[in-house]
Amino acid sequence: MKKILILAVTVNLLCGSSFITAQNNIPSNLNISVLLDLSDRIDTIKYSNPSMEFYQRDLGYLKSVAKSFTSSMLTKRVMQLNDKIQLYFDPEPRNPEINELSNRLKFHVTKNNASLELFDKINKEYTTSALSIYKQALKDDVYVGSDTWGFFRNKVKDYCVEEGYRNILVILTDGYVYYKNNLLTEVNFSTYITPQTIRSKRLNQSNWKEIIETKKHGFIPLDLDLSNLEVLVLGINPVKNGNNKYDYDVLEKYWSDWLYGMGVKKENFAFKTAVLPANMDNIINSFISKKK
């Protein structure tokens, strides 16, 4: 018979945190969503990296996210457990096997199902099933891009934001945004940004910020209230050549202006390059545990 987890034995039962943390009035229940960019950024031929392939870095980040999620359960009373974690794509892959694997990464932990076995399963699935997703995507070798703008426009409120939760969206991407079936422009705003876009707008020079602010470049704004959402963007991998020296700065500016415009608070947004997972682990844990 499954053993119901008694978190941190008697100590946590007596001293566990309340639903709303006393120090910063932040809901204690987590609702973590992961948006996975399965564009050609994971291609091991086009973007090969001898130290560690980028999809392998993603896997390390996912492992840290899952570990931070399950570890947070150990700081709470059993009766308070009502926490969620799930993974999304946009567009959804045509391969049904990938979509089935993503269903294995959706968990809702409550007082009725909490157990050490469940926590182990969450950590295991975010390692094994996630690896299978990447292997299948690499095998299919069909990259149509990632519709990050469209995900925010059509899905983020329904999928990633719930009342009474700390809503955290972790986005694994190289920072560029491109989906061939959603290429819109409104004056100097667009639904996409690529290295070519940056060069064509002359944002690859030292006065890039002045150009963005005076000519109003950026992602097309969305009329959304995301003040109850925290966004952690991981895996930024700017093009490294003489014509794109400022890509990281431009990408961060595009993302931050866009998210702040939808109400995401500055302290609830982080934009991190694709460092090795061992160096990212503490960053992820600190963001999720709110140790900033």
What positions do the PLM features span?
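Short beta-strand-loop
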Residues: 85-132, 183
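Von Willebrand factor type A / integrin I
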Residues: 197-292
